[in-house]
């Protein structure tokens, strides 16, 4: 049994999350911005399928990536050096989140519902959600979006319409984070893709303790003011 959250009702302690399905903590009827921000500060995130109530999760263990430990595969390193592309931030948030929501042959129904798009677009207007875009020949080719509270970044979803396009954006942002002292990003659940970049699982208690520390610290003021244009000879 999980908690049903009425309006303004607080989240239960994350230690009450189920072990099966791993991390399921609570459910609610809607997804207001205020509750979403509170969730991130508590180490909780929403994930639900179309037609379901909003389900809130805090799995144990938790997948994270430390930007200073980023591993870029050799094949991607060659792409970063030799392909012509431009990486930008916060230039096309709406296009990025809609592209992440688009159905694919492997995923005909996306968890990124119109309600998710609306709420995260509000976070973007508040300066809390961000997008990173890869452009090839002037066209949006890939990217991802996430949420940043203080010095804590929470990755959400990515897409690619050209080979390696989302990986290019991801690698550049992680190196930017490493250079600006951003210690940890939340990857939510284990995937082989993130593990190849150096992601690893840590105990939920360690994750929540780090989140409490990092969300209370201000992010560097110029963190999201950059772009990169790669023009190999």
UniProtKB/Swiss-Prot annotation:
Keywords of this entry: Acyltransferase, Cytoplasm, Transferase
Molecular function via GO: leucyl-tRNA--protein transferase activity
GO cellular-component term (any): cytoplasm
Gene3D superfamilies in UniProt: Leucyl/phenylalanyl-tRNA-protein transferase, C-terminal domain, Leucyl/phenylalanyl-tRNA-protein transferase, N-terminal domain
Keyword Mitochondrion: no
Domain of life of the native organism: Bacteria
Any Pfam family the entry gives: Leu_Phe_trans
Top-level EC class as recorded in UniProt: transferase
Subcellular localization(s) per the UniProt record: Cytoplasm
Described function: Functions in the N-end rule pathway of protein degradation where it conjugates Leu, Phe and, less efficiently, Met from aminoacyl-tRNAs to the N-termini of proteins containing an N-terminal arginine or lysine.
Protein name: Leucyl/phenylalanyl-tRNA--protein transferase
């Amino acid at each position: 049994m999980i908690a049903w959250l009425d309006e303004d009702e607080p989240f239960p302690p994350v230690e009450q999350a189920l072990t099966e399905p791993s991390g399921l903590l609570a459910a609610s009827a809607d997804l207001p911005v205020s509750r979403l921000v509170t969730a991130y500060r508590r180490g909780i995130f929403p994930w639900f399928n179309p037609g379901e109530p909003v389900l809130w999760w805090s799995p144990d263990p938790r997948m994270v990536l430390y930007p200073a430990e980023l591993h870029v595969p050799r094949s991607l390193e060659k792409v970063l050096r030799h392909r012509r592309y431009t990486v930008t931030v916060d230039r096309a948030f709406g296009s990025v989140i809609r592209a992440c929501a688009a159905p694919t042959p492997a995923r005909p129904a996306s968890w990124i519902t119109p309600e998710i798009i609306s709420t995260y677009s509000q976070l973007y207007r508040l300066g809390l959600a961000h997008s990173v875009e890869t452009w090839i020949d002037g066209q949006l080719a890939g990217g991802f979006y996430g949420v940043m509270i203080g010095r804590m970044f929470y990755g959400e979803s990515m897409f690619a319409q050209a080979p390696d396009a989302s990986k290019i954006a991801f690698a550049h942002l992680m190196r930017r984070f490493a250079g600006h002292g951003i210690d940890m990003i939340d990857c939510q659940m284990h995937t082989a893709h993130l593990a190849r970049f150096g992601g690893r699982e840590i105990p939920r208690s360690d994750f929540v303790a780090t989140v409490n520390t990092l969300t209370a610290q201000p992010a560097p003021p110029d963190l999201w003011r950059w772009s990169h244009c790669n023009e190999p000879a």
